[in-house]
């Protein structure tokens, strides 16, 4: 196991501002502006979340006319073809003014980390062909689809020998209902969004994306707006699996009490696979030196090569370590594989560079 530690003294001070605790969907959706009752992250978690938000993938905006068929191309080279008349007001009428189309794409390990959108289902990693979100508005009012948007995406990772790629639904937001009374003391209810902890819960959708030999793209359709869709295939790993426990030497003890952002985090990037797994489970009742995270039980393939990224924000300072590793089998008489981390102080820019380096692993 080879440790790649990037360590330099912190030379940059970052001002802490109010952290946007909304998920990506909520930030794009003006109807989700009801404050959700949830635990508050600590100051270090806010500092880390602020950095991730500033360095993460950005929304791209396009102006179109609803009565015309139009194809827009993002800076990532992906094409979205909107049929004429496909965009409608919620009452079914056709928009008459210019339409703003907002598109967000999460495509690489760096994006997966900075957007808190790991590519895993029940802790098992998925080979990702990207995550996509589209919103359309007229004068600020959300529109709906009367016909699907055709999407052609550039294939940026290895192609598995299969005819179709499963589509997935998932988000960092869950919705719950509060029952109460309105201004006339009549029973009523309100549906409110809240950030889901822990993170994404990807569920397989009934449709698929198809490889297009003519264009060299992966093609699929979006039948709804304001909904994340993910193109993923199963990892296909076979053989024995283990539970990985990651021990942090620098750990923020407020991590179990901070939600949805956390001041300590652990990620695993499988070697040469466009995927990132986030370890959400916290080691409980740990003695000094053994605080940290563990994977789902018996989920990480023994012999899997990859890179861990351990991160902690503590007292306004960032600490991190990149660690290349091959997942070992549990020692005799145990049912887990331990990995110890030696986190070093890093600046904000150094941390972002370490996250970006996952794209090359």
Language-model segments: what does each one mean?
Residues 22-79, 85-96, 104-111, 116-361:
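Proteolytic cleavage junctions
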């Amino acid at each position: 196991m080879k440790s790649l530690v990037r360590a330099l003294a912190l030379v940059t001070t970052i001002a802490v501002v109010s952290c946007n605790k909304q998920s990506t969907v909520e930030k794009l959706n003006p109807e989700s502006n009801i404050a959700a009752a949830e635990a508050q992250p600590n100051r270090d978690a806010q500092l880390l979340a602020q950095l991730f938000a500033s360095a993460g993938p950005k929304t791209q905006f396009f102006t179109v006319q609803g009565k015309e068929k139009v194809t827009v191309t993002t800076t990532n080279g992906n094409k979205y073809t909107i049929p004429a008349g496909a965009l409608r007001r919620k009452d079914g009428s056709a928009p008459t003014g210019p339409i703003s189309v907002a598109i967000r794409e999460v495509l690489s390990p760096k994006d997966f980390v900075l957007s808190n959108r790991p590519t895993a289902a029940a802790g098992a990693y998925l080979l990702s062909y990207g995550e996509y979100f589209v919103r359309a508005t007229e004068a600020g009012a959300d529109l709906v689809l009367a016909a699907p948007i055709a999407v052609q995406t550039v294939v940026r990772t290895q192609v598995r020998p299969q005819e179709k790629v499963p589509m997935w639904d998932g988000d960092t937001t869950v919705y719950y209902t509060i029952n109460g009374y309105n201004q006339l003391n009549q029973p009523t209810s309100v549906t409110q969004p809240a950030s889901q902890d822990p993170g994404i819960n990807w569920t397989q959708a009934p449709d698929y994306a198809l490889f297009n030999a003519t264009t060299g793209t992966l093609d699929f359709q979006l039948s709804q707006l304001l909904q994340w869709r993910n193109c993923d295939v199963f990892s296909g790993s076979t053989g024995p699996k283990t539970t990985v426990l990651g021990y942090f030497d620098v750990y923020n003890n407020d991590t179990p009490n901070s939600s949805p952002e956390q001041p300590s985090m652990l990620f695993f990037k499988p070697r040469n696979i466009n995927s990132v797994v986030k370890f959400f489970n916290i080691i409980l009742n740990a003695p000094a030196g053994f605080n940290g995270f563990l994977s789902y039980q018996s989920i990480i393939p023994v012999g899997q090569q990859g890179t861990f990224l351990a991160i902690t924000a503590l007292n306004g300072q960032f600490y991190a370590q990149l660690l290349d590793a091959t997942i070992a089998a549990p020692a005799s008489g145990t049912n887990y594989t331990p990995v110890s981390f030696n986190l070093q102080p890093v600046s904000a820019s150094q941390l972002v560079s370490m996250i970006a380096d996952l794209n090359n692993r």
